Amino acid sequence: MKIAFCCTNTPPEPWLLGLRAALPGADVSVWQPGDAPADVAVVWMPPQAFWDAQPRVRAIFNIGAGVDALMAQRLPAGARIVRLDDAGMGVQMAEYVCHAVIGYFREWAAIDHDIRAGIWQAREPEPRTAWPVGVMGLGVLGERVARAVQTFEFPVNGWSRSPKAIVGVRGFVGPEAFHDFLAHTRVLVNLLPLTPETENILNRDTLSRLRPGAFVINV
């Protein structure tokens, strides 16, 4: 079995070592133009020239959760696409979102400005109930983020295509519930994949339906 590794801006050594250790009988290498066609591709944002040279690939392993760039390319017919659901990205996204939400809630930017200006001004925080967080997309990563935000006792709403049962998260389902979801959101977190249905979903109309003074976290 020949495995071709073609990942933009990704050091190949850890992947090659791991694949060779797990599959000692496989021929694993970094793809170079002119190489023989592979049976399996491990990729991240490969050039179209890579796919044009892979007529027999049976499986494509995308080393990230997002496959929108991949789906925009001409891929080998019949190849199965496998993407990572989490692989460590969940906790990174959760900590990023929680850091941002708490920063807005505690007015860290204003406090930092005051410190730089030599001003001491006490700030009384609003109750957490005034800061509902709305998560768009409740897949593996979205659920991880929603649960993390919950630990800080903020109200959490979630919007998804199909019903999701996450304890403590108020669910809004489908296009008919989207505007209601936005109206109940002060911090909007976007974890939706880029598809024809979600492209440009963040627009003037969408943002105008959020609570006044809302924030958007696009991850």
Q: What is the meaning of each model-derived region?
A:
Residues K2, P132, F154-P155:
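Residues at the starts of beta-strands that form the adenosine-phosphate
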Residues D39-D112:
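Phosphate/diphosphate ligand-binding glycine-rich loop within oxidoreductases
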Residues G78, T129-P132, G213:
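Phosphate-coordination loops involved in phosphoryl transfer and adenosine-cofactor binding
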Residues I111-R144, G171:
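Glycine-rich NAD(P)-binding loop of Rossmann-like domains
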Residues T151-G168:
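NAD(P)-binding Rossmann-fold cofactor-contacting core
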Residues P163-V219:
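Rossmann-like adenosine-cofactor binding region
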